[in-house]
Amino acid sequence: MNTSNNQSIIILASRDELSYLLINHLAQHFTISQVIFEAPHTRKMLRYRLKKLGAWIVAGQLAFLVVDRLLIRRQSRPMIDRLLSGHDASPPDGRLPILEVDSVNGAEVTAMLAEQKPQVVVVTGTGIIAKRILALAPTFINIHVGITPRYRGVHGGFWAVYEGRPDLAGTTIHRVDPGVDTGAIIAQVPITVESNDTYRTLPVKQYLAALDAMSTAVQSALDGKLTTYERTDLESRQWYSPTLPEYLNFVRRLK
């Protein structure tokens, strides 16, 4: 698969290992015109959570983050390394054109999209994209680590296990609209949940499972043959980061 001269592809991404994995995979199949990395907004996200969820829930989430940083991250690394063996999850700097921005909704991104007029914009790990940005390209495609519409938001695989629905652990490739993972579904790919999985290994499995589906979606969009569908069999719900008690319940579900 490859792009012709008038079929520009831009990637909007966060700086993390899984975004690198997707970017490098797509770069093997397509000519990537530009990669735009959005800076993290930790303080802004914390303020949003406090307003949306309340101090008690946020305190539980922060307690979980401490456990994640001190324990889960380290324990998960060997399995993640095995999963990523044979794949390139290194930063694409020096190999692809890179632009660092504070926000995907800022002036630099607006100017870049207006200038390059991409046929497809791939999204991985950024914040919500404004309507005015979405109007600058015909197709925005997102990779989401959850089966929508049931697991919108973050950590969809985690929440599927938490609810006792490992059959709904998987990845959704979908068109981007102004909502939170509410765009029309292009493809959904399930994963196999194992008893030794963790909060951190599930997203790795979800990205790996959907790499080919994303490539197919991008090619279909370039060819003008992209098709979508909706799932009316699943209730729609947005999920947030887990609290420590919720993580402990997740661990019990895995056993």
Model-identified regions with their sequence ranges:
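One-carbon transfer enzymes
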Residues: M1-K255
